[in-house]
UniProtKB/Swiss-Prot annotation:
It comes from the Bacteria. Residues 112-188 are annotated as: Disordered. SUPFAM superfamilies: Cell-division inhibitor MinC, C-terminal domain (SSF63848). The lineage of its organism: Bacteria, Pseudomonadati, Pseudomonadota, Betaproteobacteria, Burkholderiales. Keywords: Cell cycle, Cell division, Septation. This is Probable septum site-determining protein MinC. Belongs to the MinC family. It comes from Bordetella bronchiseptica (strain ATCC BAA-588 / NCTC 13252 / RB50) (Alcaligenes bronchisepticus). HAMAP family: MinC.
Length: 292
């Protein structure tokens, strides 16, 4: 028997990563935009692998400075999509050229003119979780939620400087959205600041308050029967039909299938602290009042 063949093997794999789309090559503006996006999102996007897309800029990128800015926010770059001199500069900085499963189009940017209170900008879905835990909390919190909840994967930021899109990079083919389980994960205690709950391949139901600084994430729908004051993400692996439901909307961040909105200002009076649902309409995040 050839023992060397048992030491390793090659398998095809799918890697979920942030595609950070550059619309400007100026280092100062890039860093400022990155700082703002990460400050808005808190820990949502930390430790996500990054693929940098520089196909929309012609000016030379300062690659070492950009890589340092990403490292300062715990965003490890794993590859680059670029052309010409920028591709060579990225190679010289140690980045590996990659191909995306979705071709990159150099189309002009479209400005969304929908009302600001019910729209958002597109960002990526989340990667496969590797740890199993109920929330980022102490032992008594883990015990309370049991083994049904996985630790939520880190999330992905809006781009530098304006938009980023989640792309699936794969050696052979894109993958389909994972199937949803029929059994929802139910949390019957309030979630405090710093706690994170992730429902893998299913819906998440929280009976109680989701406090500011807490995060609730599901591959299916998210239901919060209580005040939603933290961050909520439904359709975490790309299910565009997923929705967020809450009996009292006062969220910090809302996301469905990679389209997210940071709620910096109070919502319209008809939505703020009212029953509401959040859904996708194309690439636009819609926030609507729930009426009995």
């Amino acid at each position: 028997m050839n023992t060397e063949s048992l030491a390793l093997d090659f398998k095809s794999a799918t890697l979920y990563a942030i595609r950070v789309v550059l619309h400007d090559a100026d280092t100062t503006r890039l860093r400022a935009a990155l700082d703002k996006r990460m400050a808005d999102a808190g820990s949502f996007f930390e430790n996500e692998p990054v693929v940098i897309d520089a196909t929309r800029v012609d000016a030379p990128v300062d690659w070492p400075a950009l890589l340092q800015a990403l490292a300062d926010h715990n965003l490890p770059p794993i590859g680059v999509v670029a052309e010409g001199a920028n591709l060579q500069g990225a190679r010289d900085a140690g980045l590996v050229p990659v191909e995306l499963s979705t071709p990159v189009a150099r189309a002009p940017q479209v400005i969304d003119t929908a009302p600001p209170n019910d729209v958002a900008t597109p960002v990526p879905s989340v990667p496969e979780a590797t740890a199993e835990a109920a929330a980022k909390a102490g032992p008594q919190d883990d015990e309370a939620y049991g083994e049904q909840a996985d630790e939520a994967p880190a999330h992905n930021p809006e781009s530098v400087p304006t938009r980023a899109a989640r792309e699936t990079t794969e050696a052979n083919r894109p993958t389909a959205t994972p199937p949803q389980s029929s059994s929802a994960l139910v949390i019957t205690k309030p979630l405090r600041s710093g706690q994170r709950v992730y429902a893998r391949h299913t819906d998440l139901i929280v009976i109680g308050m989701v406090s500011q600084g807490a995060e609730v994430i599901a591959d299916g729908n998210v239901h919060v029967y209580g005040p939603l004051r933290g961050k909520a993400m439904a359709g975490a692996r790309g299910d565009t039909s997923a929705r967020i439901f809450t009996t009292q909307l006062d969220a910090e961040l809302l996301a469905v299938a990679g389209v997210y909105r940071v709620v910096e200002d109070k919502l319209d009076r008809a939505l703020h602290n009212q029953p509401a649902l959040v859904r996708l309409d194309g690439d636009t995040l819609r926030i609507e009042a729930l009426k009995g």
